[in-house]
Amino acid sequence: DRLVSVHSALASNDVEHKVSANRTSTTTTLDNSQHKDINDLIYSLASKANNDTYGFHIDDIDYCQFNLYDEKDAGHHKWHIDFKGFEETQEIKKRKISVVIQLSEPTEYEGGELQLKYSNYTKQQKSDMLKKGSVITFPSFVEHRVTPVTKGKRLSLIGWATGNAWN
């Protein structure tokens, strides 16, 4: 509920409605310096997942943002990755782990399903992953999408754990 309160407080000022061929959503980016507690939460969740499963080198959070997908505009995000790739770029830090916290109850919306694609296999959310407060982590290079919201609104908080470029 605290995260929803932060979103509500910020939503009146710092929102960006993103409409493109790839996505339709309202995003609110958190100022890292003003919301250290939220960054710390995302980092601790990413660290636990990393220690339990991934074993990547991570040491920071890129930033966090709220995403609101609304039935009014069939809010969605098409297949994409959160990681720019293994190519040489000017960036020293790379996104390595994506962290999604579900902030809506599953009864508040229809559609809006987070799907992950592994090779030719698409993994859909399990019902317990739809509950408000549930956390989903995955490597930032895994292709994923949010299907169109057909009824209601879906709110989530997303953050990315980063580390030095891949070797």
Label every PLM stretch briefly.
Residues D1-V135, F141-N167:
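Fe(II)/2-oxoglutarate oxygenase catalytic core
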